[in-house]
Design a protein with these regions (language model features):
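Charge/polar-rich, low-complexity and marginally structured segments
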Residues: 64-190
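A positional/architectural concept
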Residues: 1-61
Length: 190
């Protein structure tokens, strides 16, 4: 398969598979041994991390430009589908979900979101599944946010709205009418 030339520009948003969306801030040369190596310097603002990727390793690393809005819409649409079969034990499925998240591929992220989303506000989801779901959703939302010029939290909410994912139930919220009717005082016996 012929190698495709990836052309990146300073200021461009890019996706590094294991980190998500970052901004290419500059290119620089570093001397390693007796060789000069040209590097792409990528800043991941949210995680406060800077990554340097050697130019000759860009393709192998999986670094890519942002996906198109059309491909992102296709990924989100695929997340609306029916959850995949759960024939494997959880440990293997979790490892597969982790691999999909770290791929940085919007379609694979959508698979994780689709398979692990809650179907109703009262569904209970194990902590490890919820954590994987949140990571996949955040990675999708990072790219969605840049494509649609919004912040990541708003993008997460928008994706969940599109997918029809029920909002979390606030167990601390009390209906004002109920609050007035309830008497929690210790009356010392009735």
């Amino acid at each position: 398969m012929p190698s495709k030339k990836l052309d990146f520009k300073t200021g461009q948003y890019v996706v590094y598979p294991t980190q998500g969306v970052g901004k290419l801030v500059r290119t620089e040369e570093q001397v390693v041994g007796d060789q000069k190596i040209k590097m792409l310097v990528i800043d991941f603002e949210k995680s406060r991390m800077t990554l340097r990727v050697p130019m000759e390793r860009v393709e192998i690393s999986g670094l890519r430009p942002l996906t198109s809005a059309r491909k992102m819409d296709e990924a989100i649409a695929s997340a609306k589908g029916k959850a995949g079969a759960k024939r494997m034990i959880w440990a293997r499925r979790a490892a597969q979900y982790e691999e999909n998240i770290n791929s940085g591929d919007p379609m694979k992220l959508a698979e994780v979101v689709r398979d692990l989303q809650r179907r109703s506000p009262t569904d209970t989801v194990p902590f490890s599944a919820r954590r994987l779901y949140m990571r996949a959703l955040e990675r999708m939302a990072q790219e969605f946010a840049v494509l649609h010029k919004m912040d990541v939290d708003a993008a997460s909410e928008k994706i969940e709205d599109i997918l029809g994912i029920p909002k979390e139930i606030d167990l601390n919220a009390v209906d004002e009418d109920e609050e007035e009717e309830e008497d929690y005082s210790d009356s010392g016996g009735e």
